[in-house]
Amino acid sequence: MQKLIILLLVAAVLMSTQALFQEKRPMKKINFLSKGKTDAEKQRKRSCSDDWQYCEYPHDCCSWSCDVVCS
């Protein structure tokens, strides 16, 4: 009976330390249920309004400064 109690206490300590370490680990963003961008969202990103517009890919660039950032 005493061995069982000691075993349960050791298991509880190990589980609590594991939970503490997992809590400190940075959480990754999970987007497997999110949908992709719509055509309107893609088009909005491509239509640059100024020289410093953000672009993701080289074919999204609308100006020379944006092209330099993408390259």
From Swiss-Prot:
Belongs to the conotoxin O2 superfamily. The presence of a 'disulfide through disulfide knot' structurally defines this protein as a knottin. Disulfide bonds join 48-62, 55-66, 61-70. Residues 20-43 form a propeptide. GO terms for molecular function: ion channel inhibitor activity; toxin activity. Keywords: Cleavage on pair of basic residues, Disulfide bond, Ion channel impairing toxin, Knottin, Secreted, Signal, Toxin. It comes from the Eukaryota. InterPro entries: Conotoxin. Pfam families: Conotoxin. It comes from Conus victoriae. The keyword Secreted applies. The keyword Heme does not apply. Residues 1-19 form the signal peptide. It is found in: Secreted. GO terms for cellular component: extracellular region. This is Conotoxin Vc6.12.
